[in-house]
């Protein structure tokens, strides 16, 4: 195995075993620490269960091969936070980037997409899919640039699709199996540059 990757995120990361797909594409070891609905901020907070797990994985103890010595930490935030609270998103990105670098890993921000037009969650936010996608792109791009993370811009990638219906699961938020494959390939391409 070549690369060793720690992925942190929520169900947008875990859906359809996307970390396993990424591992296969890169012939890498991928350790995923996820919790449905999680915000990125909790992954760098040692007082949370997920934060404690991340620190344990990064610190490693030598007894488990899957812990410690990661080349990359790939981080994904709550599905709408870069659009709805970009300052909170940027603070979380700053902390996870610092944590990754403190453990000699390169930080990668996996920026997610706007919700599908017509989805219930998008209606709740009171914006169009195009507006959300643009805000997701801007919020994540700004955070990644400010803190020196490699940026995987899924908001832009999905927004540029002529027909993105195949990308989404039925809820209009999560990726379909083909969508998760596309996300994994996009991340792999970014790491291979």
Predicted features along the sequence, with ranges:
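Serine-dependent acyl-ester chemistry module
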Residues: 72, 78-85, 115-134
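Acidic helix-start/capping segments at beta-turn-to-alpha-helix junctions
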Residues: 34-40, 114-117, 157-159
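General small-molecule cofactor/ligand-binding pocket signal
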Residues: 31-33, 108, 150-152
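Catalytic His-Asp segment of secreted/periplasmic serine-dependent ester chemistry enzymes
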Residues: 120-193
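Conserved SGNH/GDSL esterase-like catalytic core that processes O-acyl groups on lipids
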Residues: 3-8, 12-94, 101
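A short helix->loop->beta-strand "cap" motif at the edges of active sites that frequently abuts
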Residues: 98-108, 149
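A cross-domain feature marking catalytic cores of carbohydrate-active enzymes
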Residues: 77, 109-112
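Extracytoplasmic/secreted proteins, especially bacterial periplasmic and envelope-associated proteins
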Residues: 7, 17, 21, 69, ...
